[in-house]
Amino acid sequence: MKTYSATPKDIDRRWYVVDAEGMVLGRLASEVAKIIRGKHKPMYTPHMDTGDFVIVINASKVQVTGRKAEQKTYFSHTGYMGHEKHTPFASVLAKHPERVIEKAVYGMLPKTALGRQVLRRKLRVFAGAEHPHIAQSPAALTFSSAEAK
């Protein structure tokens, strides 16, 4: 028996919409990362992009557990000595809620060209409940493991 390797003509791409309202950030990000990478499909091939498109709505209403809302920070560095920037989670969520989910999903993807390509092409995040991808007729997805308890 030979090992199956997907070819571009075999891949059937679908669109999904996920409502992030009341969901835990990390659990939601791990499920979304699986879908945009294609690991939920039996034809998953590590060296190819077999994933589906995911639209995340209500990004501004995502939740974190524990005291992460006050304690979590995002780190960046300008390249100059002493120019570290630590941005609190609450301020990023208030100004750019899309970036919170994008950064969480990026952290769960491989740091390769394929991982960056999958994130850039397959993930669409919106702060509110509206999105412009109605024409793709996305199917609604729910994750019971990501819901806040």
Swiss-Prot record:
Pfam families the record matches: Ribosomal_L13
Protein task: This protein is one of the early assembly proteins of the 50S ribosomal subunit, although it is not seen to bind rRNA by itself. It is important during the early stages of 50S assembly.
GO CC, any one term: cytosolic large ribosomal subunit
Keyword Ribonucleoprotein found: yes
GO terms of molecular function: mRNA binding; structural constituent of ribosome
Name of this chain's protein: Large ribosomal subunit protein uL13
Organism: Gemmatimonas aurantiaca (strain DSM 14586 / JCM 11422 / NBRC 100505 / T-27)
Biological processes annotated in GO: negative regulation of translation; translation
Family to which the UniProt record says this protein belongs: Belongs to the universal ribosomal protein uL13 family.
Matches recorded under InterPro entries: Ribosomal_uL13 (IPR005822), Ribosomal_uL13_bac-type (IPR005823), Ribosomal_uL13_CS (IPR023563), Ribosomal_uL13_sf (IPR036899)
